[in-house]
Structures are given as C-alpha cells and as structure tokens.
Amino acid sequence: MAKEIKFSDSARNKLFNGVQQLFDAVKVTMGPRGRNVLIQKSYGAPVITKDGVSVAKEVDLTNPIENMGAQLVKDVASKTADEAGDGTTTATVLAYGVFKEGLRNVISGANPIEIKRGMDKTVNAIVNELNKSSKKIARKDEIIQVATISANSDKKIGELIANAMEKVGSDGVITVEEAKGINDELTVVEGMQFDRGYISPYFVTDTNKMIAKLENPYILITDKKVSSIKDILPILEEIMKTGRPLLIIADDVDGEALTTLVVNKMRGVFNVVAVKAPEFGDKRKQVLEDIAILTGGSFVTDDLGISFDKVTLQDLGQAESVVIDKDNSTIVKGKGLESQIKERISKIKTAIEMTDSDYDKDSLRNRLAKLNKGVAVIKVGAVSEVELKEKKDRVDDALSATKAAIEEGIVIGGGAALVHVSKRINVNTLNLIGDEKIGYQIVMSAIMSPISQIVSNAGFDKGVVINEILKATNPHLGFNAATGKYVDMFQTGIIDPVKVTRIALQNAVSVSSMLLTTEAVIYDVKDDKEDSVPAMPNMGMGGMM
C-alpha cells in the first residue's frame, strides 16, 4: 500500500482536528450534570453511557491523520484510567486544552521544543502543590465519598466498595463480577481459596450441596503426582490413628491411589479428599509454599529433597476446616505460625514493589490477600445486559480510583483544586527562559479546562465561577455543579484522588508535547484503482436457439 506524507502545520492541524472530535465526544460526560452518549455496537442493542472511558474507546475516525491524533490522546486517556482508575475525561479535556493553545503559538512562530520544556517545569510545580494540599483518607465515610464520585454519583456503588474495603483492607483483593439477578451483592471469601475442586465426586460429604467439608483436617501439600497408594501409605496409617480427615493437594491423584482412597472413603474407613494443585510451573510452587506456611505444614517436593517416605505428621498442614466443591477449595483458618505468615506477606509486598509487570503485580496481590484477609467479590446486578455492562464499568473505575485515593490522598474535586493551585505558582520562581514562558502560560490556561467543562455542562457561566474561586480565601472553596452553589468541597464530600488529577495532567501534557513537536505524518493511501472483478458484458439473448 502506498504511503503519503504531510508536514509541519498541515500535519499538526489535521492531528488537532482528530483530537477535537475526540474531545467533543467525551467532554459532554464530564461532571454531575454530564450528558449521556449513545454508541452503536456491531451487534446487539446500542449502548447508553456517561462513562468517558467507554465513549473514548469507540472513537475511530475515517481520516487517517485525524484518527492518529484521536488515537494518541485516546491511548493516553485509557492509560490514565488504567493507572489511576479514573480521569479519562479529565486527561482528554486537558490534552485538548494544551494542544489547542500550543498549536496556536507554534503556528505563530514559537519554538515547540522550548514550549515543551516550559510545560514540563510547570507541571512539576503543579504536582508539588497538589501533593502539599492533599489530605490522607482512612475513614469509611471518606471512602464512600470518593467511590461515589468515581461511580458517577451512585452512592450504592460507593457503599459497596467501602464495605468491601472494610472487610479485606485497602490493599486486599476485590473483584467485580456480574450477578445472576438484578441486585448488587458483596461476598467475602475468608481464608485461602484456589480454583481447584475435588478430583472425584465420590469425595463429597454433603450430597445436597455437592460439597466436601473436612473439620480439623491434616493437609498434605505436594507438587508430585500420586499414582500408587504405597507412596503415601505410611503417612495414611499415621493419620488414621488420629481419626482426623485428610486433604491431599497434589499435581494429580490417579490410578490405584485414587481408587483406594475413594473405596475407603465410601466404606467410611477414612475421610479424605484429593484436589489438584493450583496454577502451573514456578507459580504453582509459590502458591503451594503459601498454603504450607498458612497451614503450618511442609511443601513436599523433590526440589527440597523431601520424599513421601520421609513425611511425618509434623510435615502436614492443619486448618480449622476445609470446604471443597467441584470448582474451588477453601482453607479456613490455617494453623500456621503468625510470625512465618507475616514474613511471607512481607516478601510478597517486596516482590510487588520490585516488578514492573502489571500481570505479575495482580498475581502477587492476589496471593497477598489470600494470606491476609481473604478476597471480596462485588457482584453487580442490572435489569438489562446493556445496563449491566455500563454499571460494571463504573464499579471497576470507582474501585481503582478509591484505591488511588487511599494511596496518595485526596484534593477538592470538581476541577477546583487546579484553580487554587494556579494561585500559588509564580512564573518568576520557575527560572523559565525564552519560549519556556509560553509553555507555562499554556499549562496554566489548560488547567482551567476541567472546571470550565463541568460548569458548562451544568449550564452555568464558567468565567464567573472561576473568578469566584480565584478570589476565595478558603482554599477548599469550590463549585457544586449539581446544586449550583459555592461550597467547602471537603465538607460536602466533593473530592478527587490526587493520583487521578496528577496522572491525568502529566499524561495530557506528555501527549500534547509529542503532537506539538511532530513535524511529519506518514499514512497509508488507498489505491484509487478498484480491485473488484469487472462486470460481465451484456450478452443479450442473441444466438440462442
């Protein structure tokens, strides 16, 4: 496919057109009085949403250069949501504001490289001021406020998230799933749960619920396969003397070993359940070590030189109870030493800090929660599939934003924090030279964009509102767009996570700087020649007999 190139202002103007179209689609969702956007889907009913992330994801323009501009900002906005859980619309609005003012100055002859340096210095100063004005949160009512705002003012979602965090802690694992009915639910799985069920249904102790429950069991933890009953017969005989049940967690239990265990279970000779070990490879070894530490047992593995014939009762884990169904096993109140469990938790926390992989971080956090307070599951219900998807997206965003608020603190919301910060930053203290000062002016103008959009969407005069906040002596004064009143934002619970505001600003300026310093755009050009098969000539009926 042929390529075409556009240069300098011609290229940047086209990129700006794309960014503007994305901005126009996303901006209407901003604030408590933001509007809905209707999105056509390739299949099924259209989706109605007020979620900026969902709107941005659907933007795909026909003009290739305009689409490049839109996609760059869209990617940065999505990255903001991934990192902070919220801020897609804020990042888009800020990026548009910076790019618009920056482009006007570059066209007028300003140096884009110096502008970029000035913008970077200004952003650093703003971030420092945001951190200074932030407030740490810990109380449940504060968590409800943050989660409610991030869920587009849905207080029920805010309360669900706060309740989940109360159960498992702010660093605990909270998952969001679709409920089977229309009601929202919160369930907490206490103890260590992993996604492996009983190997044979003959291990079931409750045929009505189809579960196997073991009270005060011993637990054999190994990454080996158990095929011969002779391998584990010595330890089985020791356990039988105690009269206590046994849970076997192994790579697999099959053949003669499985048959013998099932027969003895059915005859009432010995209460035992066998399950396959969770995960695979090195991750399996790590999880089995977690289970061993949680239950006070030893991990029976060739890597440590431990064979079945050397296993004693002291090598077996113990727990208050174990519940196993066809899909999951849950170990409740393992009897491991508290000091060893804390040491294991500390090592996992260190591993989380050391890794750059989001996948590995999630996996480690999951292990951490299972060793700590368990896993909370928020089940989201709705009347229709369309409503369910939109609601689930809001819960996911609110959950991430709430964790961000706990991590870095909060500032007053509604875009007012950036207005107050602007009063405390002086161009003369930033040591700017040349066109760097233009970069400062661009950013200082752009940070008024979020509050301007929120106020405009609510039908009020943005200029009047901004001037009132700039004149205010109360550093917490802002504008409640839902009621049209000036209020103390902290007292009324209108707050934003610092992390969301910070990352939205940093990402917006980063992508705008990149677009402003773009001097050429290379894009595909469709061939004018049609590749379709030519039409058959009109044969008529002549010559037919």
UniProtKB/Swiss-Prot annotation:
A GO MF term: ATP-dependent protein folding chaperone
GO CC field: cytoplasm
One Pfam short name: Cpn60_TCP1
Catalysed transformations (reactions): ATP + H2O + a folded polypeptide = ADP + phosphate + an unfolded polypeptide
Classification via CDD domains: GroEL
Amino-acid positions noted as binding ATP in the UniProt annotation, renumbered to this chain: 29-32, 50, 86-90, 414, 480-482, 496
EC numbers for this chain: 5.6.1.7
Highest taxon above the source species: Bacteria
Keywords from the named record: ATP-binding, Chaperone, Cytoplasm, Isomerase, Nucleotide-binding
GO terms under biological process: protein refolding
InterPro entries per record: Chaperonin_Cpn60_CS (IPR018370), Cpn60/GroEL (IPR001844), Cpn60/GroEL/TCP-1 (IPR002423), GroEL-like_apical_dom_sf (IPR027409), GROEL-like_equatorial_sf (IPR027413), TCP-1-like_intermed_sf (IPR027410)
Protein location: Cytoplasm
Location (main, coarse): cytoplasm
Record-linked PANTHER family: 60 KDA HEAT SHOCK PROTEIN, MITOCHONDRIAL (PTHR45633)
Subunit comment: Forms a cylinder of 14 subunits composed of two heptameric rings stacked back-to-back. Interacts with the co-chaperonin GroES.
Biological role: Together with its co-chaperonin GroES, plays an essential role in assisting protein folding. The GroEL-GroES system forms a nano-cage that allows encapsulation of the non-native substrate proteins and provides a physical environment optimized to promote and accelerate protein folding.
Recorded family membership: Belongs to the chaperonin (HSP60) family.
Annotated NCBIfam families: GroEL, PRK00013.1, PRK12849.1, PRK12850.1, PRK12851.1
Protein name: Chaperonin GroEL
Organism: Malacoplasma penetrans (strain HF-2) (Mycoplasma penetrans)
